[in-house]
Amino acid sequence: IVARIVEKKKATLTIGGAVFAGVVTAPWIIMLVNATLGTAFNFHLPVAVMMACLSIGYTFGESLGRLACLSFGCCYGKPLSQCTGHARKLFEHFNVVFTGETKKVAYASGLAGEKMIPIQIITAVIYAISGLVGTLLFLRGFAGIALVETLVVTQVWRVVSEFFRADFRGE
């Protein structure tokens, strides 16, 4: 529904939408499995533990996915020419330049050859660290905290990173 409003497309699916649907439905599915198969076969899946596993896996998956974005040239950051002050100074020596006409940054925005904020790399690192922290918490018996940590980091960064991105996803 959100993608339909933002992108103005009648039939579209997004990763963000799938994550939202998964977070909302997964606990109910786990409880249904517990009530049916769990009762029949005498087992119980703790909801928080299963949700933590899903969230940690999602976090690592998104981290690896950003590397695919880097390769394809999508989900790109703003060009440094559009940045001012601290952001421009910080990314002057830490940026990415895309080349090749098959990169999305080239054919969608005409920004090939420009120094860009390396948002894909930053996101990959933040998510990988979050996944590792979540895994450590999980292995130490703090599944609930691992769930909250990975969900908060990925979703807060998803919002914050939008301020550093230049790719337009609506139309």
What are these regions (language model features)?
Residues I1-E171:
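Hydrophobic, membrane-interfacing alpha helices
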